[in-house]
Amino acid sequence: MAASVDPLVVGRVIGDVLDMFIPTANMSVYFGPKHITNGCEIKPSTAVNPPKVNISGHSDELYTLVMTDPDAPSPSEPNMREWVHWIVVDIPGGTNPSRGKEILPYMEPRPPVGIHRYILVLFRQNSPVGLMVQQPPSRANFSTRMFAGHFDLGLPVATVYFNAQKEPASRRR
């Protein structure tokens, strides 16, 4: 059997956070001029503001975007898995998260120790969910799978992840 070269499998996004899925939508993510590709490294200082996210699709389709860190507080002991950084629902296709309803405001990456994975997951909604979704009581111990199941979102339609680690104090500004 050949080894998988899918970066979501190699990076353990499939398994730790998501089940295997077939991408059916396009999502492009940028922090400033930096285009995010699976497994790339981003300095936390470049991710202070929410990324620019463009979603393909038709305006009559609605999407949910979730961003989590499955490595909180540390990759070797992720006992807060997953730490949720952002939730936006009811995003019209062909637009971006600013057109949706923000359930949980964006929180920039703050990896305390080790290399953390930050995962942006896009789901296609069957109907509007904005009135049903509440802000989680805590950012810790969120489950993307349980969230998707609770709101009948099914499998993701697109996902991208990046890595980040704590920057030396002299570089943070």
From Swiss-Prot:
GO terms classed as biological process: abscisic acid-activated signaling pathway; positive regulation of seed germination; response to abscisic acid
Coiled coil (residue ranges): none
GO cellular component assignments: cytoplasm; nucleus
Disrupted gene: phenotype observed: No visible phenotype under normal growth conditions, but mutant seeds show hypersensitivity to ABA during seed germination.
Tissue-specificity statement: Expressed in gametophytes and developing seeds.
PROSITE patterns associated with the record: PBP
Residues spanning the membrane: none
Alphabetically ordered keywords of this record: Abscisic acid signaling pathway, Acetylation, Cytoplasm
Induction (record text): By abscisic acid.
Localization (cell): Cytoplasm
Keyword DNA-binding annotated: no
Signal peptide stretch: none
Positions of post-translational N-acetylalanine modification: 2
Function: May form complexes with phosphorylated ligands by interfering with kinases and their effectors. Regulates seed germination via the abscisic acid (ABA) and gibberellic acid (GA)signaling pathways. During seed germination, MFT expression is directly repressed by ABI3 or promoted by ABI5 in the ABA signaling pathway. Involved in a negative feedback regulation of ABA signaling. Promotes embryo growth by direct repression of ABI5. In the GA signaling pathway, MFT expression is promoted by the DELLA protein RGL2 during seed germination.
PANTHER family on file: PHOSPHATIDYLETHANOLAMINE-BINDING PROTEIN, PHOSPHATIDYLETHANOLAMINE-BINDING PROTEIN 4
Protein name: Protein MOTHER of FT and TFL1
Organism of derivation: Arabidopsis thaliana (Mouse-ear cress)
Organism placement in taxonomy: Eukaryota, Viridiplantae, Streptophyta, Embryophyta, Tracheophyta
